[in-house]
Amino acid sequence: MTMSDPIADMLTRIRNALMAGHTSVRAPSSKIKVAIAKILKEEGFVEDYYVTRERPQPQLVVRLKYVGERKERHPVITGLKRVSKPGCRVYTRVSQIPWVRSGVGIAILTTPKGVLTGQQARRLGVGGEVLCQVW
């Protein structure tokens, strides 16, 4: 059976792993998922990511980031929200790119210039499809 929304599946796997206190999470790999993981690493939300060369489907492994000591540690990511869904796509102009939690979080967009954060898209003057929000 095929998956109807692979990006939402990846975000849900990350959310569930954070709630369970896991150090890493695995998901089937794709170019857009790797681009999202790259942005999460650049913005400091995850420690690292890499792609395994398993057959038949390569796996994206994301190492999650926590703050604090062992018993008092809290995840850096406090929330993930899928915005544009297969049944209801959400596109935005550069002037209407959303601010997430008053600038604390990020919006991730897919644009003609690639997968970008909301801030990068504003700087480049491009709009696009709002994939998700992370805070």
Provide a role label for each language-model segment.
Residues 1-135:
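Core subunits and conserved enzymes of cellular information-processing
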